[in-house]
Amino acid sequence: MNSTFADQVITFNKNLQYTGALPEGFDVLNPYLDNPETMDVMKKFYHKYYNDSNKRKFIIGINPSRHGAGVTGVPFTDTKRLESICGIKMKSAHTHEVSSVFMYDMIAEYGGPEMFYKEIYINSPFPLAIVRKTKNGWLNANYYDDKKLFEAVKDFMIDSLKKHISLNLDTSEVFILGKKNAGFISKLNKEAQLFDTMTVLEHPRYIQQYKSKEKQLYIDKYILALKK
């Protein structure tokens, strides 16, 4: 029996680990190792929405946040929306994440999670949460925040993107969240020739925090780009 899209994503997540070097002051969190329930809810999510072998469009985030995919194992999905929209309850954690709010408002207008996830797969080039040590404790970090950090994780990111593509993703056009992210993905693409066209969309966190009055405009922009 051929394995489904869901089976392959679950296998990818199960085997996910970063063993490379990191510059001082950075660390990587692996939600699947830190909380056994994360593995359970992630499996439920992919079995629910990805139990087929359809080709899908690929949306690329940055890296999981501690409160979104860093808890649920599902990109741009906090526990609130995992339960209220996807019907999957998480008992060991309760999180609210601004990016998740925008993403699920957009998904609702796209046609709902069944339709959206049937056609689209979201993940990150660095699929684990990165944190940075500050005097106030550990805070979220992006893979591109530090030149040494990017150089350290670059090969791992190319390898991860290739694994995502092998799930059966459409590489003729890829959708990248965040302009700065797109600049770095473009560097990886030059080196590894992964995608033909790169379409850049504003990052959900940026929209929620700085452009909330124009949110509908951005929802329309996403849907227009993804449905064309």
Question: Model-predicted segments: where are they?
Answer:
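Cofactor-binding loop segments of dinucleotide-utilizing enzymes, especially the Rossmann-like FAD-
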Residues: 62, 179, 203
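An amphipathic alpha-helical core segment
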Residues: 179-193
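A polyanion-binding, active-site-adjacent surface
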Residues: 2-173, 182-186, 209, 217-228
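Short, flexible loop segments at boundaries between secondary-structure elements
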Residues: 191-227
